[in-house]
Amino acid sequence: EQAKKDTTTTLKSTDGKVIYVKDDNGSFREAKYADYYTKKEFYLKTSKTTGQYRYTGWQTIDGRTYFFDKNGNKVTGEQVIQGAKYNFNSDGSLNSGSGHMGIDVSKWNGNIDWNAVKNSGVSYVIIRCGYRGSTTGALIEDPKFRSNIQGAQKAGLKVGVYFFTQAVNEVEAVEEASMVISLVKGYNISYPVFLDVEASNGRGDRIDAATRTAVCRAFCQTIQNSGYKAGIYANKTWLNSYLDAPGLSSYKIWLAQYVAAPTYGGRYEMWQYSSRGAIAGIKGNVDLNVSYMGY
């Protein structure tokens, strides 16, 4: 907490070089510890005489996505960035057949500058549209859903949605799916509709694996019957122990595992590899994902 307020101590790279940030007026200044929590783009000075700076990280230029290494150079070939594998063409542009970088957001991410998100190299976003209360069982729309999906699509990002379930039977699962279908009507959803299945110390934790799997199937089948792609979000432990993952073979799997490389032995089409990402346009941490679905 103290570091978030430290506006006097200068940020430096691991080799002792001063790190800079660009202010809203376009001028560069030395970065302070507090900037780490508010700024998303950092620079190193390349020339003391000309005052040139180099950019490190993701950048979208003329509709193509690149990644600049610590020396300010475009990377090429196969690269592992923040634990996720990507493949870049010889000119540095991200290969269309490579995994695609994306994020997922909810009301907890606050107000988002979607144009800045798009320009940072993000290609898609999975937006929480709603959830069921873990104790009351009430169905609730995420208060940021409409502004998030409208802003993301206006910025040119592909979108999908997710719903946090606390359904305890198939009837409630269909009820949740019906709510989602109503919420996304009129929006161009190109990524799947995911059911978020995870621990919450609530009503959904008390059902067995067979019932939970039946809940997932009922939700996903209702979604697919309405013309959308459907999937399940869960971590490795839940996929292995609290769900019958092979019984969900008709639906996409979105794996959550915060490691350098996934150790889950089953099939998955999308991987959430960090909950502490830093993306321009979003204050604080954000979940990072890589999709292998090819769209």
How does the language model describe each region?
Residues 1-100:
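Extracellular adhesion/carbohydrate-binding repeat motifs centered on closely spaced tryptophans
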